[in-house]
């Protein structure tokens, strides 16, 4: 009798295992199928009535009609920058006329430094704000290991030491507080606009003054066509980053965001405060600082959005609307860099 009961339990466990394995396979199969057909999900169209009213500080009147197949503006009147909708030469001249200095921050902690930093900086020298005044801020736990990269005229690199955290999640979440302190200090005094980027990516095309605005958000390459109910916002109501099913506009990528010093001080303060509140309540948002970033952009709308061309993942595959990727995700070797 006991033996028969044991066999029954084993059969039940095997059935549960096979069912779980089957559901997992179905999920992955469905996800791949969904990826093939998501190109047919409509993005919406910028209303013709507001197109002439959409002007950019650096490129003048934008050519939204040049890209009728994609969404080129938001419901609150912010432009979404796609290839062919702007004149890069106009933007470059305007930035030089204003004699701007653009800051570029990047965190290279632990093995991220040797794996990604040199390629990031070399490609930035080739494509990021070419001909403009640029100051790089590299935050790292090993300042002595930062590679030497030849810099062009009017371009500086500053290395800022940071503490290495025990978990990679803590590195991600400490970023907002570190950026807030830097923006309130030397970085805020010497830069007019600042862009904050992840290090595990590299520039592949011109990333110029056409991206500048008071508050800039990056559409996430994996989610820019998804309906709102599918977007991976924080749903735990206890978290300061939580958004309800009726909230949210787009899903923004924390690998790229930027703006004026004043606007970024508000952004980083909001995110750092939200993370601290979550920590005090023993909560950790699903996507860490990115979850808090999305909450901030829901409450404080960005004044310019960058299309996925400005931060693209090649593993997604070919997409007809992606003409010229400007920034590419490097291969993610988490097993190597997060240990």
Swiss-Prot record:
Q: Which Pfam families match?
A: Glyco_transf_6
- Active site residues according to the UniProt entry: 290 (nucleophile)
Give the UniProt tissue specificity note: Dorsal root ganglia neurons (at protein level). High levels in spleen, thymus and skeletal muscle, intermediate levels in lung, uterus, pituitary and heart, low levels in brain, and undetected in adrenal gland and liver.
Q: List UniProt keywords, sorted A-Z.
A: Glycoprotein, Glycosyltransferase, Golgi apparatus, Manganese, Membrane, Metal-binding, Signal-anchor, Transferase, Transmembrane, Transmembrane helix
Q: Which ranges does the record list as Lumenal topological domains?
A: 32-339
Q: Which prosthetic group or cofactor does it need?
A: Mn(2+)
Specify the signal sequence span.
Answer: none
Q: Any transmembrane segments, and where?
A: 12-31
Assigned GO CC terms: Golgi apparatus; Golgi cisterna membrane; vesicle
The record's free-text note on cofactor binding? Binds 1 Mn(2+) ion per subunit.
Q: Which PANTHER family match?
A: ALPHA-1,3-GALACTOSYLTRANSFERASE 2, GLYCOSYLTRANSFERASE-RELATED
Q: What is this protein called?
A: Alpha-1,3-galactosyltransferase 2
Species source reads: Rattus norvegicus (Rat)
Please name the gene that encodes this protein: A3galt2
